[in-house]
């Protein structure tokens, strides 16, 4: 194997399967969220309903995050990932049914909404376990020496699928409707399940058998609070995202303000991932190693300016750029 070979990780069959699996999961999940946001706002025309969607996902995702990390450390990663993908498949099937006109024709709008919220809540639970499981499995698929290369490929696939998922969702809603768009999501989850069968069961490395869960969680929290750099970066990022995120409002902008339809909504939803992917490429050539703190503050300031610009804009292309 050549030194500094950019394709070194791709020479491992299981890693290629892993990339396909991750693409299917991220593509399907991001597409599903777009479809559901559009459907819920179309049903209610109430901004609060979009806030409830976010709340239903974030509550289980955050409340279970530390607990999920502890469980992932204790369990076999492939088997746990299988359960996560199976859970996602069940959620996709449920949303597929509750967007199917013949199935929901006798249900009230409120019943449909509550059912969608329920499946979104289950999705938050699955996501809490899915993230740490994916990263833990990646570390077991490739040798340690090429892990940085594998992580780069994995991150690139994540960014690409994050861009394509929303974009495809927007066009598919317009072309084939919400229900059949959900069938694509269901197909992605089933494909991921099949792909996972090509990855062998991995051993549990250094399991901390019998370690109390509260002790494990306390250790993780203590590490974060004792590391001022990590704590500061996490806090700054959390505040910016918590008070500045406009993503949840995009269906309102797409339907009522910009009037760009589902295709425009998909483009708007994909725009942040496009920006993140471009910055990933830039950072590969211009590493942010010097004055990282000041650069982070500058990025947060620029983020705020973009949010203000987006909020004031009534021009579609300017909103996409923001």
Each language-model region and where it sits:
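A single, central transmembrane helix in multi-pass transporters
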Residues: 31-35, 176-183, 222-278
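C-terminal transmembrane bundle of multi-pass solute transporters/carriers
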Residues: 63-67, 74, 78-80, 84-90, ...
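MFS-fold secondary transporters
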Residues: 41, 94-99, 123, 196, ...
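Juxtamembrane intracellular "pre-TM" segments in multi-pass secondary transporters
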Residues: 1-15, 201-235
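Transmembrane alpha-helix termini and helix-breaking/packing motifs in multi-pass membrane transporters
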Residues: 38-43, 96-105, 164-184, 256-257
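Helix-loop junctions on the cytosolic side of multi-pass membrane transporters
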Residues: 102, 134-136, 140, 178, ...
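Substrate-agnostic recognition of the 12-TM MFS/MFS-like secondary transporter fold
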Residues: 16-36, 55-72, 76-91, 115-173, ...
């Amino acid at each position: 194997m050549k030194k500094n070979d950019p394709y070194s990780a791709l020479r491992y069959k299981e890693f290629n399967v892993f990339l396909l699996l991750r693409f299917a999961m991220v593509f399907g999940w991001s597409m599903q969220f777009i479809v559901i946001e559009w459907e819920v706002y179309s049903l209610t025309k109430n901004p609060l309903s979009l806030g409830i969607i976010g709340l239903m996902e974030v509550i289980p995702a955050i409340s279970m995050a530390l607990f999920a990390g502890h469980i992932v450390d204790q369990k076999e990663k492939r088997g746990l990932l299988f359960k996560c993908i199976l859970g996602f498949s069940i959620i996709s099937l449920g949303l597929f049914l509750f967007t199917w006109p013949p199935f929901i024709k006798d249900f009230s709008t409120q019943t449909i909404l509550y059912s969608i919220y329920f499946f979104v809540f289950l999705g938050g639970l699955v996501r809490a376990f899915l993230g740490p499981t994916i990263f833990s499995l990646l570390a077991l698929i490739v040798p340690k020496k090429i892990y940085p290369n594998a992580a780069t490929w994995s991150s690139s696939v994540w960014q690409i699928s994050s861009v394509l998922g929303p974009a495809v969702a927007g066009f598919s809603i317009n072309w084939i409707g919400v229900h059949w768009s959900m069938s694509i999501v269901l197909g992605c989850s089933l494909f991921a399940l099949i792909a996972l069968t090509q990855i062998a069961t991995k051993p549990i490395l250094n399991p901390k058998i019998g370690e109390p869960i509260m002790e494990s969680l306390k250790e993780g929290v203590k590490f974060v609070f004792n590391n001022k750099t990590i704590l500061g970066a996490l806090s700054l990022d959390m505040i910016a995202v918590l008070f500045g995120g406009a993503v949840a409002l995009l269906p309102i902008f797409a339907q009522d303000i910009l009037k760009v339809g589902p295709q425009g909504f998909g483009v708007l939803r994909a725009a942040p991932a496009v920006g993140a992917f471009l910055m990933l490429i830039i950072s590969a050539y211009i590493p942010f190693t010097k004055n990282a703190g000041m650069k982070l503050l500058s990025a947060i300031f620029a983020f705020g300016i973009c949010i203000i610009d987006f909020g004031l804009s009534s021009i579609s292309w300017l909103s996409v750029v923001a």
